Amino acid sequence: IPLFLHLLLMSRKLLMKRRTKVVRRMNLMLLLTLLLSPLSLRQGKLHWRLKSDRVRSKRFLEIQKLRELKKEYDLKTAISLVKETAKTKFVETVEAHFRLNIDPKYNDQQLRATVSLPKGTGKPIKVAVLTQGERFDEAKNAGADLVGGEDLIEQIKGGFMEFDKLIASPDMMPKVASLGKILGPRGLMPNPKAGTVTANIPQAIAEF
């Protein structure tokens, strides 16, 4: 705000001396800055708009009455409260944020894991498996949608991506490494920490 007032006073002084195109442009820029910045006018003074200034919906205010401010709820109570306040006609999305007090910049503090949901995501997942030898039949019998070796690797290089999860046996990883640039950006690259590089392929398929 001090910078804004300084520019405004400077433009007024210039305007009094000489009304030029430069001054008009400066005034226009100041006006746009004022309109686009999160400022509000209260009793003739400029104030930054805060989140509390926003008009809250009636539903939001009713939900706020059901919880105590600054109170920490245990997980079970918090989930019950979320379900109790879900009044819309569609299935609402619930986000959970965890503060782990770790710094992912350090290798020993990086976190990557897979959690198996008790009832899944509600959407069918197409699982592909890269393996060879005896594990080939194991993967098929375990219910994998696609099973292949070098042939499937070549298909993926050609643009084939008709799967949601890709599992690979450890002996295939030297060949799978060539798919890093294709699978990596899509989050499909097999990884031991994610449970998608394993010798126990039937178990991995069952988890997905």
From Swiss-Prot:
Gene Ontology molecular function: rRNA binding; structural constituent of ribosome
Subcellular location(s) of the protein: Plastid, Chloroplast
Domain of life: Eukaryota
Gene Ontology biological process terms from the UniProt entry: translation
PROSITE patterns hit by this protein: RIBOSOMAL_L1
Gene3D superfamilies per record: 3.30.190.20, 3.40.50.790
Keyword field: Chloroplast, Plastid, Ribonucleoprotein, Ribosomal protein, RNA-binding, rRNA-binding, Transit peptide
One CC-aspect GO term: chloroplast
Keyword match NAD: no
Protein task: This protein binds directly to 23S ribosomal RNA.
Subunit structure comment from the entry: Part of the 50S ribosomal subunit.
NCBIfam families (UniProt xref): rplA_bact (TIGR01169)
The family this protein is said to belong to: Belongs to the universal ribosomal protein uL1 family.
Protein name: Large ribosomal subunit protein uL1c
